[in-house]
Each structure stands twice: as structure tokens, then as C-alpha cells.
UniProtKB/Swiss-Prot annotation:
Organism taxonomic ancestry: Bacteria, Pseudomonadati, Pseudomonadota, Gammaproteobacteria, Moraxellales
Task of the protein: Specifically methylates position 2 of adenine 2503 in 23S rRNA and position 2 of adenine 37 in tRNAs. m2A2503 modification seems to play a crucial role in the proofreading step occurring at the peptidyl transferase center and thus would serve to optimize ribosomal fidelity.
NCBIfam families, per the entry: rRNA_mod_RlmN
Residues given in the record as S-adenosyl-L-methionine binding sites: G200, E201, S232, S254, L255, H256, N335
Reactions catalysed according to its record: adenosine(2503) in 23S rRNA + 2 reduced [2Fe-2S]-[ferredoxin] + 2 S-adenosyl-L-methionine = 2-methyladenosine(2503) in 23S rRNA + 5'-deoxyadenosine + L-methionine + 2 oxidized [2Fe-2S]-[ferredoxin] + S-adenosyl-L-homocysteine; adenosine(37) in tRNA + 2 reduced [2Fe-2S]-[ferredoxin] + 2 S-adenosyl-L-methionine = 2-methyladenosine(37) in tRNA + 5'-deoxyadenosine + L-methionine + 2 oxidized [2Fe-2S]-[ferredoxin] + S-adenosyl-L-homocysteine
Further facts: Reaction proceeds by a ping-pong mechanism involving intermediate methylation of a conserved cysteine residue.
Example of a GO biological process term: tRNA methylation
The protein, known as: Dual-specificity RNA methyltransferase RlmN
Any Gene Ontology CC annotation: cytoplasm
Manner of cofactor binding, per the entry note: Binds 1 [4Fe-4S] cluster. The cluster is coordinated with 3 cysteines and an exchangeable S-adenosyl-L-methionine.
Start and end residues of each Radical SAM core domain: 130-373
Disulfide feature: C137-C378
Native organism: Acinetobacter baumannii (strain ATCC 17978 / DSM 105126 / CIP 53.77 / LMG 1025 / NCDC KC755 / 5377)
Gene Ontology molecular function terms on file: 4 iron, 4 sulfur cluster binding; metal ion binding; rRNA (adenine(2503)-C2-)-methyltransferase activity; rRNA binding; tRNA (adenine(37)-C2)-methyltransferase activity; tRNA binding
Length: 410
């Protein structure tokens, strides 16, 4: 019996609105949660207030996790009343909260109008040389359009991009979950690291993701170190170049194959941006003027698929591919999902693969699988608490049809 703790909202199918949707047109309010400092400064000037109020309000929202303007005690009563009339601070609705026996936490959020769509966020705790680390894996889209063959999220299809308040709301809620019983004056930020590795391709929702990361780095909000915010991409090359100009954060590449033929199968966007272009973009990202610690290397993510990309020749090809790219390699044991066409590489195979890379001088780690008891491990970010999306159902039907054809041919 699983020891995960599941806390559900009272009405799974209720009509509570998300952060980006007002209760009614007449009651429409401006949601301040996803606004950057520059946006908040303009907002306050537009309503006839001094722009320094932006920093004050940001601190109350993102450092003390306050949603009631009446609690913002360093702001005049008149301004608080004004904000109450025209503004709100509203994160996406939490449908379920899952707490794993290993400390992993997962939130299922409802976003969009009416019953909306579901997205998931996972927090993974760990101990390192700096102490207790809490890494939050944030989603950027509802579903994903890239359809990587080993990823369960992609099999849901793509529905829409998340808004900045829906993205930053995931970080807000994760922090608040540790502080909700703590007096406001004693609250502190708990999440130490953010990885944009959840549902969706972050670089295909570029503006909203960029705005959200600026809030993460802002000292008036979460004040996170640039090296503690990581964006993971499957390889949208033009946007990698744009990212290098717009913000300094750590970059991770969902590589998963050491040659174009195999990567075309596993990560279809490779057909548009093949490996030579992707590696060159990574080199440009690292070499960008103004390089700081966040850009000293690129993290390479490599899911280990039994008999597919885990053979000795694949390790040798990977060494050749990465020889001129400062990188750290993270080997990820595959997490099977229903109808998945792959299996997980054996532990011995993964260790052997790691040894080949380490012996060649690369820093190579094996990701510890966490949160399996709550379907929170990487590749399992699917909405299992509600009906499958229409596209997921269609995909399952196609799988069944293919299996039937194979049986009849056999």
C-alpha cells in the first residue's frame, strides 16, 4: 500500500476559475501574481501611484506569500482599499496535492476557463553540500506539441501555453505549502532550485517563460541565483540564441540520442534542428559575452532506453558529439507509462554507460528516481486524477488498433 498522502479539493469538477480567469466580466480584476517588477511599476504609475510600490507589493506576494491586501502593513490603508477593488493575487486552483514517502511533493493545478485543463508540478527534496535542497520542476504548457516518443506528456497532445501567473503560481504554491501554518512575519522562501522541465517545451512559450524567470531572479521576489534556475529544451535552436541575449540562466538539453537518425525517432524536433545545429547553439550560449557561472556548461539529459540508446557504441558516439561542448551528463532511468514502446535500461547497463563517459573526463550522474508512488517521476507528468484528454484517448485507440493489426498478421 502506497504511503503517499493525497489531499483533494472538495469539488474536482467544480467551476472555480483559474488565476487568469475572473469570476465574471463585471468582477474582472487584475492579477498581480505573474507581473514582473517592470510591469508592476507601470501598473502603479497607471493608477496614479508611485512606482516604488511595485517592490513593496512584490515582496508581500513572493516573499511572505500574502494574498490579502489588508495584510500589507507598510502600505497605506487608502491604497490597500484601492488595490482590493481592482486587483487580486490568485494562483491556479489546486485540484490535488500528493506527498510521497520520499519527501517528493506533487501538485495538480486546474488552469483555464470552466473545468479547465490540468498541469502538474513536482518538488524534489535532496541533501547536498550546501544543505537541504528543494528543486521544483515547473510546467510551461498544457500538454506538449513535440511528441517525443518516450514521453507520456507528449501523448496528451498540445492544448495551450500557460500564462505568467500560471507559471509563477506553481513556484508560489510550492513555497506556500511549507509556510501556510507559519505567521506572516516569519515566512521564508523554501524552494532553492527551479527547473523548467515539466509539461511542455518552455522555448515554445517563450515570452511567458522569460517573464516568469525574471520574477524568479528578482531580489524583490524569489531572489534566486542564476545558476539555480535551469531551462530545459528539446532543441528549439533560434530560441536558444534569443535566450542567451535576454537572460542568464542555466541551460539543459533533452538530448536522449547521440546521432541524428536515432534522435529523429526519439525527439522529432531534431528533423528541423539536427544535432550539429543544436550543439553549435549550445556553444554560442556558453560563449556569449557577459558569461556568468550559470553558463559555464550545459547539462545534457539522456533517458536510458533498453536496447535503444544504451549500447557501448552509443556511449562512444556521445563522447564524440560532446567533445567540444563543456557539459555535465545526467543519465535518466526511463519511467514506463501505459503503452510505452520502451523499457528501462538495466542498472548494470546504466552504470557501464556512466563509466564510459566518466572515464573520458565527463561529469556524469545517474538521476535518482523519486516520487514513483505518486506518478511524479520525470516522464510521468500526466493528468491521472481526471479523464484523459481527447488526444490521449485517440492515441491509446491507435495503439490498440496497431496491436490488433499485428495480432492478425501474426
Amino acid at each position: 500500500m502506497s504511503s503517499a498522502v493525497v489531499v483533494s479539493s472538495e469539488n474536482l469538477d467544480g467551476q472555480q476559475q483559474s488565476s487568469s480567469t475572473p469570476a465574471s466580466p463585471a468582477a474582472e480584476k487584475v492579477n498581480l501574481l505573474g507581473m514582473s517588477r517592470a510591469e508592476l511599476e507601470k501598473f502603479f504609475e497607471d493608477i496614479g501611484e508611485k512606482k516604488f510600490r511595485a517592490g513593496q507589493v512584490m515582496k508581500w506576494i513572493h516573499q511572505y506569500f500574502v494574498t490579502d491586501f489588508a495584510e500589507m502593513t507598510n502600505i497605506s490603508g487608502k491604497l490597500r482599499a484601492k488595490l482590493e477593488q481592482i486587483c487580486e493575487i490568485k494562483a491556479p486552483e489546486v485540484v490535488h496535492r500528493h506527498y510521497s514517502k520520499d519527501g517528493t511533493r506533487k501538485w495538480v493545478f486546474r488552469v483555464g476557463e470552466g473545468s479547465g485543463s490540468l498541469v502538474e508540478t513536482v518538488l524534489i527534496p535532496a541533501e547536498d553540500k550546501t544543505g537541504s535542497r528543494k528543486t521544483l520542476c515547473i510546467s510551461s504548457q498544457v500538454g506538449c506539441a513535440l511528441d517525443c516518443s518516450f514521453c507520456s506528456t507528449g501523448k496528451q497532445g498540445f492544448q495551450r501555453d500557460l500564462t505568467p501567473d500560471e507559471i509563477i503560481g506553481q513556484l508560489w504554491m510550492a513555497n506556500y505549502s511549507y509556510m501556510e501554518e507559519v505567521p506572516v512575519a516569519e515566512r521564508e522562501r523554501s524552494v532553492t532550485n527551479v527547473v523548467m522541465m515539466g509539461m511542455g517545451e518552455p522555448l515554445l512559450n517563450y515570452d511567458a517563460v522569460l517573464s516568469s524567470m525574471h520574477i524568479m531572479l528578482d531580489d524583490f521576489a524569489y531572489g534566486m541565483s542564476k545558476r539555480r534556475v535551469t531551462l530545459s529544451t528539446s532543441g528549439v535552436v533560434p530560441k536558444i540564441d534569443q535566450l542567451a541575449k535576454d537572460i542568464d540562466v542555466a541551460l539543459a538539453i533533452s538530448l536522449h540520442a547521440p546521432n541524428d537518425e536515432l534522435r529523429n525517432e526519439l525527439v522529432p524536433i531534431n528533423k528541423k534542428y539536427p544535432l550539429a545545429q543544436l550543439i553549435a547553439a549550445c556553444q554560442r550560449y556558453i560563449a556569449k559575452d557577459g558569461n556568468e557561472s550559470a553558463r559555464k556548461h550545459v547539462t545534457i539529459e539522456y533517458v536510458m532506453l533498453e536496447g535503444v540508446n544504451d549500447q557501448p557504441e552509443h556511449a562512444q558516439q556521445l563522447l564524440k558529439l560532446l567533445k567540444n561542448l563543456p557539459s555535465k551528463i545526467n543519465l535518466i532511468p526511463f519511467n514506463p507509462f501505459p503503452h510505452a514502446p520502451y523499457g528501462r535500461s538495466s542498472r548494470n547497463r546504466i552504470i557501464s554507460f556512466q563509466k564510459t563517459l566518466s572515464d573520458a573526463g565527463f561529469v556524469c550522474t545517474i538521476r535518482q528516481t523519486r516520487g514513483d508512488d505518486i506518478d511524479a517521476a520525470c516522464g510521468q507528468l500526466v493528468g491521472q486524477v481526471a479523464d484523459r484528454t481527447r488526444r490521449a484517448e485517440q492515441w491509446q485507440k491507435k495503439v490498440a488498433q496497431r496491436q490488433e493489426i499485428l495480432r492478425t498478421q501474426g
